Structures are given as structure tokens and as C-alpha cells.
Amino acid sequence: MAVEKVYQPYDEQVYNSIPKQQPQTKPEKKTVSRKVVVQLTKFEKVLYITLITVIAMLSIYMLSLKMDAYDTRGKIADLDYKIDKQSSENSALQSEIKKNSSYERIYEKAKKQGMSLENDNVKVVRSNGEAKN
């Protein structure tokens, strides 16, 4: 559904017959504004400079703390990696020790070197160094 706007035909005589009124002009008051520059006192200048300096020093100090924390975090990560690597090496060596210290392996090595097992010559040594027959 379309909407059409109907315009009245332009009639120049009707347009010219309407009296044109001149707008009444009122005398305008001119306002003059002056820019007034307010001077800061010495105390205010010193106060502002001190505040800006303190803020700058605090921001530098905070950045320094952030850098130190970042470096420390990196060192911690490096140490964690080294600890993990060393613990894996330790576990590998521990399993190798268990394998090499088994009774069968020791008995086999002794046989290869010409030794024999005689129960009379065997001494059981405890972990505190005492010998038991």
C-alpha cells in the first residue's frame, strides 16, 4: 500500500498577494567577555610539582617491582624444570641400582669370577654395621 502526498499547485499570484512582514529588530546587547588568566601561587606550584614527582617515582617503583617479579617467575620456572629433570634422572638411576643389586645378578657375577657360595663363609651385615653369623 503506497502513500502519496498531495501538493497544492503553485500559484504565483497567491504567493505575491500575501503581505510580507519585516521582522522587528530589537537592539542587541553585546556582551564582552574577557579571558582572565589566574596566576598560581608559589605554594600551589610547589605542591603540583611535588605531587607530579611523587606520582612519577611511585610509577617507576611499581614498574621496577613488576620487572623483579617477572624475573623471579622466570627463575622459578627454570628451577622447576631442572628439578623435574634431576628427579627423572634420579628415578632412572634408582631403577638401575635395583636391577644391578639383585641377588641373581650378584650370584651370576660371582660364578663368572670363580667364586662359590658356602654358607659357612657368609656373614650377614646389617645397615648399622653389625655382623651376624
Swiss-Prot record:
Q: Where would you find this protein in the cell?
A: Cell membrane
An example GO BP is: FtsZ-dependent cytokinesis
Any Pfam family the entry gives: DivIC
Keywords, alphabetical: Cell cycle, Cell division, Cell membrane, Membrane, Transmembrane, Transmembrane helix
Primary location recorded for the protein, binned into one broad class: membrane
Specify the protein's topology with respect to the membrane.
Single-pass type II membrane protein
Q: Which GO terms describe its cellular component?
A: cell division site; plasma membrane
Q: Which domain of life is it from?
A: Bacteria
Q: Outline which residue ranges sit on the Cytoplasmic face.
A: 1-45
**Residues passing through the membrane, by range:** 46-65
Keyword hit for Nuclease: no
Q: Which residues lie on this side of the membrane: Extracellular?
A: 66-133
Family to which the UniProt record says this protein belongs? Belongs to the FtsL family.
Q: What does this protein do?
A: Essential cell division protein.
NCBIfam families from the UniProt entry: ftsL_broad
The identity of this protein, by name, is Cell division protein FtsL
Question: What gene name does this entry carry?
Answer: ftsL
